[in-house]
Curated annotation (Swiss-Prot):
Its EC number is 2.7.3.9. This is Phosphoenolpyruvate-protein phosphotransferase. Belongs to the PEP-utilizing enzyme family. One of its GO terms (biological process) is phosphoenolpyruvate-dependent sugar phosphotransferase system. Mg(2+) binds at residues 433, 457. Its main location: cytoplasm. The reaction takes place in three steps, mediated by a phosphocarrier histidine residue located on the surface of the central domain. The two first partial reactions are catalyzed at an active site located on the N-terminal domain, and the third partial reaction is catalyzed at an active site located on the C-terminal domain. For catalytic turnover, the central domain swivels from the concave surface of the N-terminal domain to that of the C-terminal domain. Its cofactor is Mg(2+).
């Protein structure tokens, strides 16, 4: 008899294969054992650190080939952990001062760090805790002489089952053999979930108990569309899911026919579908999925996973590469959006109680122009290689925009005096992610060239609800009428001044939100490249006039639930 296990759908698709249990190695040791040869124990610890660096470098290089530099940057962070004196020194001191064995010293110190990071109401720091756990486990395995599981050695068709997959586990998965995976813990934003989407393999996380309910070699189905795992399916279930898998692949193939199609409603209104990217390595997916531009080019990758600022030349090459590849299509580059939630040793950013409301993004750039000016110079120099738009993140006041624009114009003049060619067709815009900015959209619209609505932050700032907090996640409501009214206000203000508005938050690619946004008059929908073809098919089947009527009714609703019901009645 088959068994159904429910989890969180982390990556689309259907996988059918036998289970491969990722068995946790025995990393137990005598915590109370004292050592007499202190120097020898320190040397043992140092040797484990070096061996871990060698392994992680190999994994990092493999991840860059399979997943791109953006995802491989996780392992740059792991390597930095192994070089962090604030972590390494206390471990060595514990061995020397307390005669602790290397395994005890390592686990005691890293557990303290993990506990501190996990207690913070900050998703980035919680991810740092996961990084330290992963690195600590690798170092401990070398101290104890125990081999960690190596998913790269799998040479037959399997679905991996485990408590969790660490970033290094996921980076070693071979798509040829690993059909999918399912884990006890994790969420859609965990490292393993993000990487599974990059690898395009079905994944389900957060099942809570799958390792207790599945045996090695069981046949299992991973339904990444609905979050279901079926263990030892019946013949009928097997046939049904084989059909479902074939339909999924057929649908993907059918969607490819829309790659070069226009995005136009049944009543002839055009919309622009653009892609969000994190590095130039994301370009193949952008082109493959028929993006009509790039609506958000995040530039943080240039600053992460390193111990010094990127040079102007490094930045110039990264911007030039994307502009050339897009061949005249619009590329919207967001200037540095970073703050105290990210640990960059060379920036010496202050620790803050709430870094998401603190010294970050445009605030940091205006205050530390030695960071801002090289980025603007690199962007201006790259502007002649394509259609460049520049937008400033987290702008709260018109004076912030004016100051940023003045600095950019100053650097433009400097570059021209140095003999550089600069495009005269660069549009300057802002991210609308703060309610105050949306409230003054009519004021901003007179001075900016465009708006890009960042719904992820706009929603949590408007509803005062941390989207990463389980306790208040019910308040993170993309379809709340208050959000729809703000979006409408921004779009109408831009159109009144002959400007355009895009959206680059998750809402832009959401199938419930798309009819509403179309009706509100959104000009550009920017989303994950893998969502573009589905969105194109959806928009091409909608009537702009009908969606305008829908949107006008939606903004008069009282609750998110009413809005969803309204959309479902309009779009069947």
């Amino acid at each position: 008899m088959s068994k159904l296990i429910k989890g969180i759908a982390a990556s689309d698709g259907v996988a059918i294969a036998k289970a491969y249990l990722l068995v946790e190695p025995d990393l137990t040791f005598d915590k109370n054992e004292k050592v007499t040869d202190v120097e020898g124990e320190v040397a043992k610890f140092n040797s484990a650190i070096e061996a871990s660096k060698v392994e992680l470098t190999k994994i990092r290089n493999n991840a860059e080939v399979q997943l791109g530099a953006d995802k491989a940057a996780i392992f740059d962070a792991h390597l930095l952990v192994l070089d962090d004196p604030e972590l390494i020194q206390p471990i060595q001191d514990k061995i020397k001062n307390e005669n602790a064995n290397a395994a005890t010293a390592l686990t005691d110190v890293t557990t303290q760090f993990v506990t501190i990071f996990e207690s913070m109401d900050n998703e980035y720091m919680k991810e740092r805790a996961a990084d330290i756990r992963d690195v600590s486990k690798r170092v401990l395995s070398h101290i104890l002489g125990v081999e960690l599981p190596n998913p790269s050695m799998i040479d037959e068709s399997v679905v991996i089952v485990g408590n969790d997959l660490t970033p290094s586990d996921t980076a070693q998965l071979n798509k040829e053999f690993v059909q999918g995976f399912a884990t006890n813990i994790g969420g859609r934003t965990s490292h393993s979930a993000i990487m599974s989407r990059s690898l395009e393999i079905p994944a389900i996380v957060g099942t809570k108990s799958i390792t207790q309910e599945v045996k090695q070699g069981d046949i299992i189905i991973v339904d990444g569309l609905n979050g279901d795992v079926i263990v030892n399916p019946t013949e009928d279930e097997l046939i049904a899911y084989q059909d479902k898998r074939e339909c999924y692949f057929a649908d993907k193939k059918e969607l490819q026919k829309l790659r070069d199609a226009d995005t136009v409603t049944v009543d002839g209104v055009h919309a622009e579908l653009a892609a969000n990217i994190g590095t130039p390595n994301d370009l193949p997916g952008v082109i493959e999925n028929g993006a009509q531009g790039i609506g958000l080019y995040r530039t943080e990758f240039l600053y992460m996973g390193r111990d010094q600022m990127p040079t102007e030349e490094e930045q110039f090459e990264a911007y030039k590469e994307v502009l050339e590849a897009m061949d005249g299509k619009r590329v919207v580059v967001r200037t540095l959006d970073i703050g105290g939630d990210k640990e960059l040793s060379y920036l010496n950013l202050p620790e803050e109680m709430n870094p998401f409301l603190g010294y970050r993004a445009i605030r940091l750039c205006l205050a530390q122009q030695d960071i801002f000016r090289p980025q603007l110079r690199a962007l201006l120099r790259a502007s002649v290689y394509g259609k460049l738009n520049i937008m400033f993140p987290m702008v709260a006041t018109i004076n912030e925009f004016r100051e940023a624009k003045a600095i950019l114009l100053e650097e433009k003049e400097n570059l021209k005096n140095e003999g550089h060619d600069i495009s005269d067709d660069i549009e300057l815009g802002i991210m609308v992610e703060i309610p105050a900015t949306a409230a003054l959209a009519d004021v901003f619209a007179k001075e900016v060239d465009f708006f890009s609505i960042g719904t992820n932050d706009l929603i949590q700032y408007t509803l005062a609800a941390d989207r990463m907090s389980e306790r208040v996640s019910y308040l993170y409501q993309p379809y709340n009428p208050s959000i729809l009214r703000l979006v409408k206000q921004v779009i109408e203000a831009s159109h009144k001044e002959g400007k355009w508005t895009g959206m680059c938050g998750e809402m832009a690619g959401d199938e419930t939100a798309i009819p509403l946004l179309l009706g509100l008059g959104l000009d550009e929908f920017s989303m994950s490249a893998t969502s573009i073809l589905k969105a194109r098919r959806q928009i091409n089947g909608l009537s702009k006039n009908e969606m305008t009527e829908l949107a006008n009714r939606a903004v008069d609703c009282a609750t998110q639930e009413e809005v969803i019901e309204l959309v479902n009645n309009y779009v069947k």
